[in-house]
Amino acid sequence: MTSTPPPLGLLLDVDGPIASPISRTIAIDSIADDLVALANAGIPLVFNTGRSDAFLRERVLPPLLERGVSADARIVCVCEKGAVWFTVDYRGTSEPIVDESLAIPEAVARDLERMIREDYDDLVFFDETKRAMVSAEQLVDLSSEDYLERQLVFDADALQIMTAAGLGVERRGIRYPNDTGAVEYRIDPTVISTDIESNRLGKDLGAQRAVELLGATGPIPQRWRTVGDSRSDYAMADWLSEHAYDVAHVDVRPAEGVPDKPYPILVVDGAINDEAGAAVLRRWTELVADETTPEVGGGISLHVAG
């Protein structure tokens, strides 16, 4: 095990920057090419996602493994916003580990599953692959407008089940404490799903898990790049910045609003989602091969506030 830290570490959201939001797979071949090239060059890769471990193993990792991951590659997958994790090497994937303290109580999870399957089967499907969270995802043949119109009602029904079970819940910024005044869970809607989860989960917890896991396999990079498509993804860079790492964040969907942060924010001109992800991965591959390669330029820009 070398004692020299790698020159760079990558902490990557999956949906948007890596997996196409349309196909929900790696649709751009160069993304898989560059991820493998970076990993085989000794750059630690972390996939930090709200998705399940099964989603990564079945939809995202196969093209990487097909291209050949070396024995020196360090790839960590943190799933369900920090509740589940596993590693990847040339032999394949390890068994997932679950932090059971972050799971929705079993009886409540069953009631939520029953509601999803019986009352909302024309709106969402129950994600059977989640181990700690309860997730209901929009049916692929349903329009976004129709889904979002009914999502509010779905979320309200989920809230009723949870509060009736004595759980303290946060939903859309409003807190509903339990009898002791505690709020330990949240209902977290996205544009294609609702996640029902412990409020300890988040992309910042995923970043913490990633650094801990990488520390067990070798030196930790001081310089990091995080990539995401939503405001919640900035929590990855927030955590790294707060812990004195040199970090910049790439926002692949900046039109939704770029917050003020104490670290640099990069954007890709004229590209969003996985097209933007492909552009920055290609630039980092070139940079690792030749350290004189500028990170900014050629369509990659430093975001300027205002």
Residues covered by each model-derived region:
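A short, Lys/Arg-enriched amphipathic alpha-helix followed by its capping loop at the start of a domain
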Residues: 2-11, 30-43, 240-243
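A short acidic (Asp/Glu
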Residues: 56-60, 88, 136-140, 234-240, ...
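Well-ordered, non-membrane alpha-helical segments in soluble/globular domains
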Residues: 29-32, 103-116, 145-171, 278-284
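Conserved acidic, metal-coordinating active-site core of Asp-based
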Residues: 123-225, 232, 238
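Active-site phosphate-binding/coordination module
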Residues: 29-130
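Mg2+-dependent phosphoryl-transfer enzymes with acidic/Ser/Thr/Gly-rich catalytic loops
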Residues: 4-9, 197, 204-306
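Short loop/turn segments at strand-loop or loop-helix junctions that form parts
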Residues: 10-16, 79-82, 88-90, 128-131, ...
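Asp-based phosphoryl-transfer active-site loop
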Residues: 3-24, 47-48, 207, 237
